[in-house]
Amino acid sequence: KITHFLGIVDVYKQLIHYEKPKLFKVEPKYGKDYMEPDAFTIWRRSPFFIEVQKSVYSKKIMQDKINRYELYFHSQEWHNESWQPKGSKFFPSILIITDKQYDINSSNLRIFQASSISKFMDSLAVKA
């Protein structure tokens, strides 16, 4: 469990290299049927659920994880989060920090996979 928390700390340190998160919660709880992200952050004016995957999981386990996010999405409980802007509601993107690319999908969620925050930033950079 210690190496897992060190992984979360490492991601935080990578985030502040670019910009200090407005909010960074470690292992926030959303209810037993819903997802259990390693962190929730508001970073660069966008909300993210962060999963730090140092272990390799099966496609089924990863899809089950995503399905829990889907359940939370459909519950609309996220509309009531204190960080939500007054006028419009945003469901956070999911950022999976992993060395393995998983074949997972969702029609409702924005899912990013990268081995580090810098690789994630590279993937967002406009290709000239």
For each predicted feature, which ranges?
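Conserved beta-strand termini and adjacent loop/short-helix elements that scaffold enzyme active sites
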Residues: 26-29, 97-99, 114
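Solvent-exposed, charged helical/coil patches
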Residues: 1-17
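Active-site metal-binding core of divalent-cation-utilizing nuclease and nuclease-like domains
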Residues: 12-48, 54-64
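Charged, structured surface patches that assemble and position nucleic-acid processing machinery
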Residues: 108-128
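Short, solvent-exposed polar/charged micro-motifs at secondary-structure junctions
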Residues: 32-36, 105, 123
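Catalytic cores of nucleic-acid endonucleases
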Residues: 54-111
